[in-house]
Amino acid sequence: MTLLSIPKEKAKDWIEGICFFILGFIGALIVGWFLFPMALYSEHTQPIDFNHAIHLENVEGDTLTEKCLYCHEFYEDGTFAGIPRIEKCEDCHDPESPMGDSLEEKKFLTKYQAQEKEIPWYHYYRQPPCVYFPHISHVKMAKIACKTCHGDHGTSELLPVYQENRISGYSRNIWGKHISGYKEHTWDRMKMDDCAECHTKKGHEEFNSCFTCHK
Amino acid sequence: MKHEHNKPLHRYGMVIDLDKCTGCGTCVVACASENNVSVRPDESDKKRFISWMQLYMITNGKEYPYTEVCYIPRPCMHCEEDGHGNPHPPCVSVCVATATRVDINTGIVSQIPTRCIGCRYCQAACPYHARYFNWWDAYFPKGKGLERYLSPEVSVRMRGVVEKCTFCHHRYMRAKRKAEAEGRRELKEEEYITACTEACPAGAITFGDLNNPKHKVSQLIKSDRAFRLLERLNTKPKVYYLSSKEWVRRMADNYLPEELKPVKPLALRR
């Protein structure tokens, strides 16, 4: 029975029904794609509002990647420092003579450096414990710039809000910015398929072996 | 079912000299602490315990003074074939979750606990009993400080998954990372060895790349004394054993009388 063959008095019911279905569908999408993620992720602001742009101007290095590596360094055994400890900050920051008059620097000097306490940063890109990711293979051997995967994070003046999945405890940057699975940038999502996608694209299918990234 | 399979670049393998092995069990302990192997309140429950490196004792069954004893340390054999000529180990062909594969770079049989669904089919397929099932979540006695000794390089397994020896694959990654920091892509022979190899006080275990003729393992496997466990199953393990005792070699794989190649006595070989 097509819509046209329905008697006039019943057609109204049908149109109403279809409208309700469309409204309900859109409503469900709004709940699922916008309201649910808001409930799923808890938001945290970083302990210090770190300004990457200012630091980038003041560190040595010819290329952008070399400048990043000044603080986010590699150790001798090839391990990656990640977010540096306050020892690294102390190379430049001296409590006697602050480098600027910013409140954030004062906070660092009084709250953390004076008490010799590590800053409890939230890690945007911390992978689950079953994942192994060697930065050295990507940065040194494959010569991939930091910017390729982390975007403008290194030149930003403000740190983004850290969003943590309330169920799994992982960062939203790992889990995916868009719940629909849509991905615009490398830094939107860093899951297994994203590793494999890039390996395949670059012609390194041998690195799609399970043990390359799992431990 | 035949998988597309390329020959691995490296074929890491192990040679265990049973003439040198004293059965002290250091390899078992070293392995367990290296790989965050969980313990049970009752470790004597041998049906449920986990030991990636298992130590077996065999005797020739004769009465004193002719009794002889031999200890056989048994890691995962990292087989190359399933016994029917297919280029994957018995455990890999049965895995329904693709949780275990032959690593294309190293030839090591990988086991991904987070991928495993715990059906235990691989455990049934493995002729060497090298796979263990986690009946409980990983347990480390509280207040003993054991959890502080956990290695961050190996993930702790949850209940309901199978685990096994990985030839300390994280050590391979560690060696590779260091080589890359020095600008090299190839590893030196001594850079990547397993925890059991390093720990063995008798120096009975040798580890290296079987594809590289310069490595000591590829020379040792050509010895008269070399054999593999259950060789007649044709799973082509990458773990070799050395023994000059005929009864040991016979017990390792019930040979028919004409099958066993005799080993020349030590005095004649020199």
PLM features per residue range, with description:
Chain B
Residues 1-270:
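Non-ligating segments of multi-cofactor redox enzymes
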